[in-house]
Amino acid sequence: MRALYFRTTTLSTFFILCSLASNDIPRTGGNKIVQPPKPNILKQGCPSDLLHSRALRSIQLACRSHPATVISAFEGIQEGLQNCANRLRFQQWDCSEAGNIMHDPPLLRQGFRESSLIWALSSASAAWGVATACAQGWIDDCACNNHMGQNEYEFGGCTHGVQHGITASRKLLTKVGAVNSLLRKVEKHNLKAGRLAIKKTLISSCKCHGVSGSCQQKTCWKRTATLEHITDYLVEKYARAKLYTDDSVVKTTDLIYLEASPDVCKVKSVAGRVCAWRNETHTQGDCDRLCCGNGFSIRHEVVRVKCDCEFVWCCNLVCKDCIQHRWISTCNGTPPKSLIF
């Protein structure tokens, strides 16, 4: 698992550094669009855990025919889960142990409110990952045209990559066969809500054309929002998720769930979780609440961190090394009580 995390971090960092740059304004050399090099993991094919995945037959098939698409989707999901863990870091349930949908985690065999978020976030993140890879020119099926034509204003961005990402997410993550149970129905609904989140958060990008930068003509296209923004959008939906019954009337963009969630303190170990011991307002990050009454420990750390970072076009982030003193408070606790959360 440690090696898998390293692989994920490598590609996800590249996503962050280059995705907005390629989606906004194409880098050109003469009349040719200059694309960043394809990461090595997209050239190596699917790893064995995806190639032999038992969770989704579609993953196995796509790994053989379109491995770069599967890997881009997987990495997008991993990035989405990391964003979710950061966004919910002050909540008792924080996404950190939810598991990737492509590995069939226990949480997605239940109909909890938390399950609805992971379904939707996985669907949206997979679409985002593929759309970003398309915009970079890393996936042959949807890469932007290599040539812009005689006039630069003819270039209309990479809008088709967004739809390709949404379609790929649907094909990869939606289970085939009849929807014959409430859980499958809820799963399918939340996956669709995640794909719709991509459309709801699209950003318009425009480029002016004319003498000396005047806007005599303008080319506009749609691009995906940052994954952080998409995650925030879905977390807000999660906070307003609706309990679903046979006669429920819900919007396609709503997140829905089937049953009340268990008490996190009774099913999930909090041992080692970082909390804010100096927080006297007893709100975000409060140790008493996050540690479920198990108490906490405080230790001093001297850590080396990156600082004074500069973005060097394209796509390198150059930073200095700095020393930082930290007081870290972590929850005491017992071993994990459940594999669900």
Swiss-Prot record:
Which residues are modified by lipidation (O-palmitoleoyl serine)? 212
Which residues are the signal sequence here? 1-21
InterPro entries, alphabetically?
Wnt, Wnt_C, Wnt_CS
UniProt keyword list: Developmental protein, Disulfide bond, Extracellular matrix, Glycoprotein, Lipoprotein, Secreted, Signal, Wnt signaling pathway
Domain of life of the organism encoding this protein: Eukaryota
Q: List the glycosylation sites.
A: 279
Gene Ontology CC, one term: extracellular space
PTM: Palmitoleoylation is required for efficient binding to frizzled receptors. Depalmitoleoylation leads to Wnt signaling pathway inhibition.
List S-S links within the chain: 84-95, 134-142, 144-158, 206-220, 208-215, 265-292, 275-287, 291-331, 307-322, 309-319, 314-315
Q: Which GO terms describe its molecular function?
A: cytokine activity; frizzled binding
Q: Where in the cell is it found?
A: Secreted, Extracellular space, Extracellular matrix
Q: Which GO terms describe its biological process?
A: asymmetric cell division; canonical Wnt signaling pathway; cell fate commitment; cell fate specification involved in pattern specification; establishment or maintenance of cell polarity; interneuron migration; motor neuron migration; nematode male tail tip morphogenesis
In which broad location class does this protein mainly occur, judging by the first location in its UniProt entry? secreted
The entry's function note states: Ligand for members of the frizzled family of seven transmembrane receptors. Affects male tail development, vulval precursor cell specification and egg laying. Involved in morphogenesis by influencing polarity of asymmetric cell divisions of the B, U, and F cells in the male, and the T cell in males and hermaphrodites. Controls spindle orientation in B-gamma cell division during male copulatory spicule development. Involved in specification of the P7.p lineage during vulval development.
Checking PANTHER family in the record gives: ABNORMAL CELL LINEAGE PROTEIN 44, WNT RELATED
Protein's name in the database: Abnormal cell lineage protein 44
| Species in which this protein is naturally found | Caenorhabditis briggsae
Instruction: List the gene name.
Output: lin-44
